[in-house]
Amino acid sequence: MARGINKVILVGNLGNDPDIKYTQGGMTITTISLATTSVRKDKDGNTQERTEWHRVKFFGKLGEIAGEYLRKGSQCYIEGSIRYDKFTGQDGQERYVTEIVADEMQMLGGRSDGGGMGGGGERPQRQTSQRQDYAPRRQTRQPSQSPQSSPPPMDDFADDDIPF
């Protein structure tokens, strides 16, 4: 018997540049604020927009990719799970936080949209994560090093092979 499903799918735009941190073990944790907007008509027939802001966290390799390619204004597709945490603030008050822990991410839009990939006939790349639980919240950044990163792998077929 299934224990339950915790699945979130979001498509939205980044409200700020990614915040990148590292655990003591060197794992990357990238946090973004993602805005989603829904549109509906009110009882008078007027269009109403509602924007929701979501805190999204990426871990490990997916965190590295998100930190490198996403920028404020970028549009992206995210799959993950929702998590609710409770902690005590420095003032002694209990605080609650809701986060989306991303398992997959796909950059949408072209380079002019700040998407970092796509455009120019390229297909946006879908990235998945081998998620691990992370260390305590307060982490320090590792000494600044320029990690050599390779671009995400391309598919085995040409764009001409796609039937649309």
UniProtKB/Swiss-Prot annotation:
Domain of life: Bacteria
Gly residues bias spans: 111-122
Gene3D superfamilies per the UniProt record, alphabetical: Nucleic acid-binding proteins
GO CC aspect terms: nucleoid
Listed GO biological process terms: DNA recombination; DNA repair; DNA replication
Keyword Magnesium found: no
Xref: PROSITE patterns: SSB (PS50935)
Keywords: DNA damage, DNA recombination, DNA repair, DNA replication, DNA-binding
Alphabetical list of Pfam families matching this protein: SSB
Motif (Important for interaction with partner proteins): 159-164
Entry annotated with the keyword DNA repair: yes
Annotated SSB domain residues: 5-109
GO molecular function: single-stranded DNA binding
Residue numbers spanned by region Disordered: 108-164
HAMAP family in the record: SSB
SUBUNIT field: Homotetramer.
Functional summary from the UniProt entry: Plays an important role in DNA replication, recombination and repair. Binds to ssDNA and to an array of partner proteins to recruit them to their sites of action during DNA metabolism.
Entry protein name: Single-stranded DNA-binding protein
Gene it is expressed from: ssb
